[in-house]
Amino acid sequence: MEQQQQKSAAHVSKLFVCTAVDCKDEIEEKFERSYVSLQQQIAGLSDKEMHDMLTQIVCKEKQHEEISIGFLYIILTDPAMAPKTYRDITLVSRDGMNVIVANLTLLVAEKYAKLTETARRQLIWVLREFVKHQVLSVENVIWNCLRQAGGGDVSHKNLFLVESLLDIFIEYRAWLEAIPFLVQSSVYSFVRLIEDHANPALMPLRQKEVKFTISLIRDRFQDIIPLGRDFVRLLQNVARIPEFELLWRDILCNPKSLHPTFNGIWHLLQIRTSRRFLQCRLLPEMERKLHFLASSVKFGNQKRYQDWFQDKYFATPESHSLRSDLIRFIINVIHPTNDMLCSDIIPRWAIIGWLISSCTNPIASANAKLSLFYDWLFFDPAKDNIMNIEPGILVMYHSIRNHPFVSSTLLDFLCRITKNFYIKNEDKIRLGVYNSLKLILDKQVIPNLHPLFESPKLDRELRNLIRENFREFVSPVANMPQSIYPATHSIQAPIFKKEADQRMLQSENIDVGSGAFAANSGTISLVDDDNKIAITPVESSERETEAVFSDDDGENIARCNKNDENTDDDDDLPLSKVRLKEKPVPEKVELPDAIAESFEIFVTKRNSFTWEAFLKDFRTLPASTLDETQLNYVISNTVLILRETLPQQNVFSESKTEEKYLAKSISYPLYGLFRFLYENEDKSKKPFQTLLSEICERLSETGYLLLYFMKIHCKLQTRKNAQQSYQFKTTVYRQICEATDEKIGICLVRDLDLLEKENTTIYLWLLPDIYREFKTIAINNTDLLRITLRCVDAKNVRDIMYSIAQGKLTIFKQDGLIDCIRESLEYETYEQFCLWQLIQAHDVPLKCIQDILPELEAANHPEALSHLLLLLKNEEPTSEIIRLLLSREAKTRGDPFVTSALRFWCQRCEEKLSEIIASLLTSKYPSSSPNKRKRPSKGSSAASSTPSADHVLNHLEHYRRSCRHGTGTGLYVHDMMQRALQSAYSHSNESTKKQFSDLFALAAEDETTAVGRRGGSGRGRKQPVGKKDSNNHNAGSKKNSDVVKTIYSSDENSSEEDWSKHKITQAAKKRKKAINDSD
């Protein structure tokens, strides 16, 4: 008995709180094992002996990790030994504590809830030490601690963590501000947490949070802008706090005071908040449970899971605010795959409906509804994802019949929020809601809006409100049909949906270091790649979809098989019994004999061979043979089969070289259409053209799959018959474009955009073929270029440059390239750097793009200026380049770009550069009219890029100022430059002379003449002298020899000007001696 007690006592963990029924998992065993192993090795050793022994042991990777975790265990469980143990770690660790940080990150993400009170306090202590000593990657641990600071939780345990993290951020503010992502996460988290700390007992903490958050927002607003629209939603909840009220005033009335690039509240509302910030407001454990509910629980079996979730996370009054966080996460992060959409797993809208309908707090309920429709208000079909608006319409659509209260409250809220959310931009909000509803109908997320908007179960006031707000989607009153539910149609079109991510976010574990979900062997990136194509096939008549928010176990589901007439008016039917009706079986239509047999075989066998056989018969069929009903029957069934036979995932080949994979990837019926078009280019009859048009319109991926097919088909055919050349036929693609009645350039860009979003690897693989076969469209095409630049990484750029160097790919031609560069100035920095890499790979001469030099601004176009400066370094100065450079606007502090170019040219060809600039300056002062500036003629084409005299003098003056310790001023001592400066002086007015007095002082004068004293033009070089200048010399400087003098109007002690004076004086002596010798 005693042995059993000792054995059980030995297993009591100091790190984790365990009950009698808890089993240790891998993480817990790993920490316990490492601690025991370390204790066995260092028991009875002095500090020196321990360090010596451990230093030898940690050379091996496994032992190093074990010892590091053992020390971490001691720090977390023994506060008294923590400082000494931390010193021991710093002596023993050989990887900058990387192993300790990684394991601590894992511990916080997976086991924080099970840590003892002592361990949680020690965790804060060690984090403070890590931040204090700038340990690498400690921000990963901090970020996961922020995730553990849950919303809607005012327990002592949670408040301790919140306040501890806040103290670390305040104390080490400089460290925090150096990590923009952590700045964003902390601001987003604390603005959300402040909402929960309204209790008077929490006012000191709340005030500290407010002071820190407001300070960080104002100081780092450039980092706050990417938080986007959900940050605005959180700010609304704390707007009555005085400090936030002042912030709101600045955002609305004085946005530039926060940051020069900030344009106001609409700027934030147009930015979609990253999934990472929505994720950081959910506890990791809560996130795993939510993923399980949305990916593994069948419809009808969810009630017990929802009850457990309710008891676990919604038990307190403060926890109601958590519902908004959950809804935003479900909408923006959990995007089910096609397989899940087709399965009997509980859909997203049902979970959201349960969260809203079970909320009893009116404020939390309003916030939850706003969370549901938030993306509707700013929806842009070009860049937003239909999966973010799909749950809102589906929860209303599936509730209207049997639970109209849910639908009516949501519809009322949508109508009112559209008008009142942002009155100043009501038209833009309405446009967002209109775009949402239009796309919902276009993609057939629901068949139509009549059952929802025109339901008799809505009260009259609400129906009038709907008509007022959504008149485009409501039929006139006089024409309202008797039955407002969808009628039965014999021909069904497939339903299309877009997803942000086709991969299923169903994992139970989270890789906290990289912020990605891990599902078994794969990882799901949180990088947003919206608008990928995903399909929901039409449901068969054999299967039903159950639409419920919750359900009681053991309930008899046979009631759901009643006919429509028995359930339409059943207002008492609970939400748990809501179901979709069965889809009607399409009625068969008799077809002409010429195609009836082949079409029947195709519908039955659904393979590429039977499809091509039908196309052969159908292609020559005249329009008079088919009526509209028959044609629609053929089209709808054809499109449905083509869609269903395409694989929902892995549409493309797994290998780019192995024939079996390549051939398999184009073996589906849709590719049979492409093969048929490839082999039959003759003009087809009208029914065939109509069929082709409908396929292209309903299957948006048709275009890029055709491009993929031609690449594979040509590759395979060439391998089979190397003697015959197989062409990448652009005429086939033109047929597709003609069928959709769009220009080929527009179609090509659209299809390649879809392809890149679907599969970047295949897009880059096809790129050389696209530029080769569609060269007139693709080369210098900025839209196609932008698609490429947004998806490439360093390796992709390298591969593209290889193709360019080998002559396989040409992206640019010299004519028109400058327009591409102009448009690229608005691109992201990385995209612009990649662009310049590709330009350099094409060996584009500078003369083709040099005209853009005067247009570039130092503050707005640093990327282009950086690369152009490198190109200039490889060029010799020419009159044209110098003219363009000096045409650039000279700011108050000068133009560093021009100065840099002049300096490195001075080192190589100083005299040539001096002559070019002098010639340009002299040309501004014609000798025939010394007192009059030359004006460019009205018909001069180069007038706009020709620098004025003031431009040239400005750049020369700023260049002079940049010459420290005399380096580079040799530019001014050459004869032509001296004469040019003297000429400029003699033709300048008094203000110009005063402005550039130091520059003019670098011009030497003759013994016999002086500029400014005589207006005539003598033989020698002239020196500008002012009356005041002669009085500025030191009284001690009395030696006025016959040597040429130089005059300085400011800072006579400057080393650069002393050097210049000395050098110019020497040059003047040499010239004088040469003249005397010649005499």
UniProtKB/Swiss-Prot annotation:
The keyword Iron-sulfur does not apply. Keywords: Cytoplasm, Nucleus, Phosphoprotein. It is found in: Nucleus; Cytoplasm. The keyword Transport does not apply. One of its GO terms (cellular component) is nucleus. The modification Phosphoserine is found at S1049, S1050, S1054, S1055. Signal peptide: none annotated. Residues 938-949 have a biased composition (Low complexity). Residues 1062-1073 have a biased composition (Basic residues). Component of the integrator complex, a multiprotein complex that terminates RNA polymerase II (Pol II) transcription in the promoter-proximal region of genes. The integrator complex provides a quality checkpoint during transcription elongation by driving premature transcription termination of transcripts that are unfavorably configured for transcriptional elongation: the complex terminates transcription by (1) catalyzing dephosphorylation of the C-terminal domain (CTD) of Pol II subunit Polr2A/Rbp1 and Spt5, and (2) degrading the exiting nascent RNA transcript via endonuclease activity. Belongs to the multiprotein complex Integrator, at least composed of IntS1, IntS2, IntS3, IntS4, omd/IntS5, IntS6, defl/IntS7, IntS8, IntS9, IntS10, IntS11, IntS12, asun/IntS13, IntS14 and IntS15. The core complex associates with protein phosphatase 2A subunits mts/PP2A and Pp2A-29B, to form the Integrator-PP2A (INTAC) complex. This is Integrator complex subunit 3 homolog.
